[in-house]
Amino acid sequence: MTSTSYARPERTPFWSALFTDRRIAPALGLGSTSGIPFLLVYATQSAWLSDAGVSIAAIGLLSELTLAYKFKFVWAPFLDRYDPPLLGRVLGRRRGWIVVAQSGVMAMLVGIAFGDPAQWLAWTIGFSLALGFAGATLDLVIDGWRITSVRPPEKQAVLSSWTEIGWRLGNLAAGAGALLLADRLGWRGAYLAMGALMSVGMVAAVLAPEPSSDKRPHPPRAGFVDTVWAPIRELLGRLGPMAPAILLLIAGFRMPGYVASAMAIPLFKHQGFSNTDIATVTKLFGFWIGLGGTFLAGALIPRIGMFPSLLIGTVAGSASHLSLAYLAAHGGDGGAAFWTFAVTVGIDGFAYAFASVVLITYMSTLASTEHAASQFGLLTSLCAFPGSVLAGLSGFVVERTGFTWFFVGTSLIGLPVALLAFSVWIKVGLSDETAPPADTRS
């Protein structure tokens, strides 16, 4: 095996890439449209349903409309193997599916906008279910384009970071932006405005360079079983004996964050902070702090390498929960402890954003160009599932231990994950045995 770029990372400029790499600006636009749909079928829509007088129980049940995001790996193999009708010939497989998915998101947003959950909730549910499917599909195909556009980890880190920045901007628009518009234009106007914002992604998809893998002859069509199984078989075969350790690392990487996040808002409320305090710090201040963590990850990975960054991400992501433990022990005076609250959220948000970009980059390097959407979708689901399950038990743990020891405990969860990351680094970090088939295009 040849030595991999993990060992000798190539210096890749982060800021100048926005102007010198023709993939970056489209990635920023595509990321922004990827960040819009989720909140519009989740938290933002919950606000509309509350205004419409829908019961709390029903609103809670309707949060399950986001299930498509958890199971998107199911239909991902078909997006990897088949071209979209008509558009595939013009834009290629990846960009063609992006336009199809964006069109679906726009259409569903218009459908929701012209509904009235107070009068006909079934209409809203139907279009929201379709919006969840279209939004999850959009995530898949954008990830597929990003992964197949560039392979070396140091370049993938830059592209992933700019895509993540776009996602955060879109998420801000669909969250705080949509709520502000709803106060001024009503909910119909807010959802129509979000649909109009999706046009940014249409332009970005047309301007985005076609991945070179899209220009190669596609593999022959296969049956249903082979289409679904082929990405899993290829990934496990390529990872070889290290597959269990690598997959366990991915499953555990975000586990501390998922478990801690479930109790973060309850902690803030328990400590006496108002809704305004929480919104100001977590949404406005937290947005900029998160961008800082994203910028740092995109700049650091090309300089120190993938595995050192992965180890830092595991340690920082879990150790940051000690700041939440400190707030639980010393921040119980509400507004009087506002700056303790702000610093705590800043530390946790910065570390979370940094670790997220590192993990996205690492999972992207594990996915092959042929099965990019399928394998990345599988890895993201593997990453989310264990933490989501444990998060459901977090309230019971807090009742037994209190907030302080709970967050100390979530930070300690990261210790075995960090040891596993170090072990994987030692065993495979100096070779390219787990890297996808050689493809070092810039």
Question: Where in the sequence are the language-model features?
Answer:
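Symmetry-related core transmembrane helices of the 12-TM Major Facilitator Superfamily/SLC fold
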Residues: V100-M106, G189-L207, W405-S423
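C-terminal ends and interior cores of transmembrane alpha-helices
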Residues: G96-A118, V315-G334
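Glycine-rich segments within core transmembrane alpha-helices of 12-TM secondary carriers
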Residues: Y69-K72, A157-A182, T380-A391
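Juxtamembrane intracellular "pre-TM" segments in multi-pass secondary transporters
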Residues: S5-D21, S212-I246
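Helix-loop boundary and gating motifs at the non-cytosolic
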Residues: P9-Y69, A243-L249, F253-Q271, A279
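C-terminal transmembrane helical hairpin of 12-TM major facilitator-type secondary transporters
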Residues: P308-L359
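Transmembrane alpha-helices of Major Facilitator/SLC transporters
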Residues: A68, K72-W75, V281-R303, G313, ...
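Helix-to-loop junctions at the C-terminal end of transmembrane segments
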Residues: K72-V90, G292-P308, V398-E399
